[in-house]
């Protein structure tokens, strides 16, 4: 049995939001499945359509950022690229667009579903540590999800950023470090489900990290975990509730 470390009180814990605190990507996956079925492409297989959509999403991120608005744009753009030209009659194409917008609207209307143990764990951790929410995406979308989650009172600050890279992590810890002059970078921890956005860049910025595995993590966030720099820590967990035994 692997012995978990015991971390002293007084840490600053930065929490990711989507697929760390609440379900998120599973709803996008449902929309993608519906999109592929709606497209019913006669040349590309469903797997090939999905790969084309992934390519479009990678492009769209650079111009539209992350979030539902960007995703909707990607669906429509992918539809335009893969639709036969000309596609007749026109009203059929318009109907497809309406269906695609409906897939996105279903995500927007989805109730927030907290992951198991999240509320209770945050409540306990907040008595021993400083908790900060650090999520990327559209500011209005993420702020709305936080408000609907009922978790806002557990966080002393909220950081909604355009991208999570080492420079952003350094900026965030620098801003909050000024509030506690004695707090070192190694007393900051990033906790999340994404190796690409939560773990690797946080380690590169000098933080410790906790990788919280989620089986539905967005494919564009998939990558191998980087080696842990000397003097830093990386903890891997399969359950949010296990945090209380460590922190």
Annotate each PLM feature.
Residues 56-106:
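A metal-dependent, Asp-based hydrolase signature
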């Amino acid at each position: 049995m692997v012995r978990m470390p015991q971390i002293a009180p007084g840490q600053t814990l930065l929490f990711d939001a989507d697929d760390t605190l609440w379900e998120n990507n599973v709803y996008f996956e449902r929309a993608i499945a519906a999109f592929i079925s709606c497209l019913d492409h006669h040349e590309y297989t469903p797997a090939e359509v999905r790969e084309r959509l992934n390519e479009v999403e990678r492009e769209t991120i650079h111009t539209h950022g992350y979030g539902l608005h960007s995703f909707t744009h990607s669906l429509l753009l992918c539809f335009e690229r893969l639709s036969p030209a000309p596609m007749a009659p026109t009203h059929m194409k318009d109907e497809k667009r309406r269906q695609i917008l409906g897939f996105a609207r279903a995500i927007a209307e989805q109730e927030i579903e907290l992951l198991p143990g999240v509320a209770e764990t945050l409540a306990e951790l907040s008595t021993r540590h400083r908790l900060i929410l650090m999520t990327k995406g559209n500011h209005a979308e993420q702020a709305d999800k936080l408000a609907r989650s009922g978790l806002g009172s557990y966080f002393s600050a909220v950081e909604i950023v355009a991208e999570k890279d080492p420079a952003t992590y350094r900026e965030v810890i620098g801003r909050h470090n000024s509030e506690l002059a004695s707090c070192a970078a190694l007393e900051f921890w990033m906790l999340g489900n994404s190796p690409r956005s939560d773990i690797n860049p946080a380690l590169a910025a000098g933080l410790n990290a906790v990788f919280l595995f989620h089986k539905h993590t967005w494919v564009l966030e998939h990558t191998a975990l980087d080696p842990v720099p000397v003097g830093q820590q990386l903890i891997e967990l399969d359950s949010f509730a296990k945090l209380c035994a460590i922190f």
